[in-house]
């Protein structure tokens, strides 16, 4: 097995954060990311970057964190009791972009690395991550481009990787209490250690590097699309699903809160404005109803 290199992973993640912020900041053109470096009392720290009230991005957060501790929180050991009592290190980049224009989808991406150690035993390590897209008004060409970019990122590692990670994404980003997917999916993977370290790390890098070419063309294509109050109100309503998922189901949010993470950074993914309407149903045959019938369904996009 190739040797685990925490420093190589950390260097990559810091560089990825830089590249994503540069690309998205350039696409916005009006606002820049504000950096907030922080330390965690129990061990570790990170740097959070937030762009707010831009010309294109209403709120975007790109967070790097590297935290460690004496034992993993319950969210990490629930499915793997053999990890109980091990010290851990966790590092990753996580981002959510909430655009102003309702015709631009929200995007989320995350790549992360965990290692759990115990004296006298081999370290247990794994990678996780992925990216997913949440449109408000769907465009088929955008979703196909998103999934095609995801597929290309996975191809060097085996033809089974894209369909496996796509299905995993569809299953993970699903609001059980609403009986609907959060968006149109993408890739999701966790507990990845089936390859040696170098190959697993290369797969994580390939997926991390694919986020900007997957999202930036969609952002550029839709950011100047005309919209009115109707579209804005529907966007705010659908953002409610994002909030529900992140606070009820998201593993990263739960892990962060259980491990004593930095609350401002953990909740950075939430949109600045959102609304809930009681028992809302879109008008039949409207652009809003099209989202439910054409996009928030299980589909093979490529």
Swiss-Prot record:
Annotated metabolic or biological route of this protein: Porphyrin-containing compound metabolism; protoporphyrin-IX biosynthesis; protoporphyrinogen-IX from coproporphyrinogen-III (O2 route): step 1/1
Residues the record marks as active site: 108
Example GO biological process: protoporphyrinogen IX biosynthetic process
Assigned GO CC terms: cytoplasm
EC primary class: oxidoreductase
Start and end residues of each stretch annotated as Important for dimerization: 242-277
Cofactor(s) listed: a divalent metal cation
Reaction(s) catalysed (UniProt annotation): coproporphyrinogen III + O2 + 2 H(+) = protoporphyrinogen IX + 2 CO2 + 2 H2O
Matches recorded under InterPro entries: Coprogen_oxidase_aer, Coprogen_oxidase_aer_sf, Coprogen_oxidase_CS
Localization, UniProt: Cytoplasm
Residues reported in the UniProt entry to bind substrate: 94, 110-112, 260-262
Its EC number(s): 1.3.3.3
UniProt keyword annotations, A-Z: Cytoplasm, Heme biosynthesis, Metal-binding, Oxidoreductase, Porphyrin biosynthesis
Single GO molecular function: protein homodimerization activity
Site residues, Important for dimerization: 177
Binding residue positions for a divalent metal cation: 98, 108, 147, 177
Record's subunit section: Homodimer.
Purpose of the protein: Involved in the heme biosynthesis. Catalyzes the aerobic oxidative decarboxylation of propionate groups of rings A and B of coproporphyrinogen-III to yield the vinyl groups in protoporphyrinogen-IX.
HAMAP family (alphabetical): Coprogen_oxidas
NCBIfam families, alphabetized: PRK05330.1
Family statement: Belongs to the aerobic coproporphyrinogen-III oxidase family.
Protein name: Oxygen-dependent coproporphyrinogen-III oxidase
Organism whose genome encodes this protein: Alcanivorax borkumensis (strain ATCC 700651 / DSM 11573 / NCIMB 13689 / SK2)
């Amino acid at each position: 097995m190739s040797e685990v290199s925490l420093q190589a992973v950390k260097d990559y993640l810091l560089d990825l954060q830089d590249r994503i912020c540069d690309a998205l900041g350039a696409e916005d053109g009006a606002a820049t990311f504000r950096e907030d470096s922080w330390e965690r009392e129990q061990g570790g720290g990170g740097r959070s970057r937030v762009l707010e009230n831009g010309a294109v991005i209403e709120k975007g957060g790109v967070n790097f964190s590297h935290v460690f501790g004496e034992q993993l929180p319950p969210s990490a050991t629930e499915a793997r009791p053999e990890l109980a009592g091990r010290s851990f290190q966790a590092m990753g980049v996580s981002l959510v972009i909430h655009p102003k224009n309702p015709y631009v989808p929200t995007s989320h991406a995350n790549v992360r690395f965990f290692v759990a150690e115990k004296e006298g035993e081999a370290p247990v390590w794994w990678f996780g991550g992925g990216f997913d897209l949440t449109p408000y008004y769907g465009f088929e060409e955008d979703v196909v481009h998103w999934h095609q970019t995801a597929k290309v990122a996975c191809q060097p590692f085996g033809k089974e990787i894209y369909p496996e990670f796509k299905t995993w994404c569809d299953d993970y980003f699903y609001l059980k209490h609403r009986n609907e997917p959060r968006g149109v999916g993408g890739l999701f993977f966790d507990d990845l250690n089936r390859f040696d370290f170098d190959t697993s790390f290369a797969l994580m890098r390939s997926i991390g590097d694919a986020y900007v070419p997957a999202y930036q063309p969609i952002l550029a294509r839709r950011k100047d699309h005309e919209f009115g109050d109707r579209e804005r109100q529907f966007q705010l309503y659908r953002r409610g699903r994002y909030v529900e998922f992140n606070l009820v189901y998201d593993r990263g949010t739960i892990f962060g809160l259980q491990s004593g993470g930095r609350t401002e950074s953990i909740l950075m993914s939430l949109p600045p404005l959102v609304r809930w309407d009681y028992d809302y149903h879109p008008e039949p045959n409207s652009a809003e109803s099209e989202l439910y019938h054409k996009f928030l369904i299980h589909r093979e996009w490529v």
